[in-house]
Amino acid sequence: MNLFDGVYKSPPKDLIETNIKNTRENFTYYYSLFFSNILNDSKTDNFTTYKGNMLGYDNSAISKDNEVYGEYSPELFYKLNKLLIKNIKEYYEESNRFFFINAWNNYFEGTYLEPDERYGYGSLNALSKSLFDLPFRNSNYNLSNLNDKCLVAIHAHIFYKDLLNEIINKTNNIPIKFDLYISTNTKEKMEFIKNHTYIYSKANNISIKIIENKGRDILPFLIQMREVIDKYKYLCHLHSKKSLHDPELGNKWRTYLFNNLLGTTEIISEILSDFENYDKLGFIFPENYYKILKFTMHLDPREKERMNFLFSKIFHGYKFSDKYFDFPAGDMFWARTKAIYQIFKIDLRNDIPQEKGSKFILFAIERFWLFIVKINGYYYKKYFNYY
């Protein structure tokens, strides 16, 4: 057995940490500042010393003297891994190259190396990519087939016109030709949207229609796209989401969805490349926002009733399963049109209530997308782009 002398500096021990909040029972730190501190730890030792990395951490559920490392992301974890690995390769012989991760051992200590609801396998994937010197995101995008003819449609329902510019700016990140379809519910809003969109949008073609705000964004989406969906290969649906009972949550949730669907040209290119490379990939949506996960775990009996109603309208011989299942909470996503086309071919105008009525048909449709995808022989993928 070969032995060697060396010391592993287990983070966050012996590092200068910057508190977000510091009380007698609560110590909260920025993971991003830990990132900087470990890189700037230039102390020279007279023996072999290995810098280590760690993940986000939150043991407040089990300890009064808790520590929380907020603002963690798999991308930051990946970047720090890469820098530490580079340091190891520069200073140590191959036989003495060791890379240590403080993964905190237990789920109940709130670490992220194990798969969890917030990041899925994101941290494990980030670790493997850094170890094997792979790019964090695939950058070999070939979208030339989508530029010859406009095969991408974006639909946005604009109820809150103050969010129009935010939507235009996000859609302008699309690196290929796309057509933009916008629905709204009043003539005044339509004129406002026209005046801004025709000036600032990079869309190939723009279509704006007044459609009754019945069923929030859902009925306008289905009605406006019904006659044109067959022209396109891929479709992205957005809407001017707000939450009147919790404005701060609504804004953060909307921003999270927009960023993960259209946040950068690179993100959009990766999504479209995945569709192009995998013929049976039918639907892509962000991991559900972590602050609303508790509302997505259960199916109300009335929602189940509406799900069965939708099945009877579209499919015959299929029985809805009421097991826990994924769905795009917030109803924003990318889709292959062939994977979801049936729902655009039925008339639901008399089945969707006014906003003051029951919302269970709306929740049912939101939960219905992935069932259509699976029945049509496609699969779905959840994205998390670290916003």
Residue locations for each model-derived region?
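ER/Golgi luminal nucleotide-sugar-dependent glycosyltransferases, focusing on the catalytic module
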Residues: 10-44, 52, 57-74, 78-86, ...
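Substrate-binding cleft/loops of secretory-pathway carbohydrate-active enzymes
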Residues: 1-13
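Short aromatic/hydrophobic-glycine micro-motifs
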Residues: 3-4, 47, 377-378
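Expand to "…catalyze enediolate/carbanion chemistry for C-C bond making/breaking, isomerization
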Residues: 100
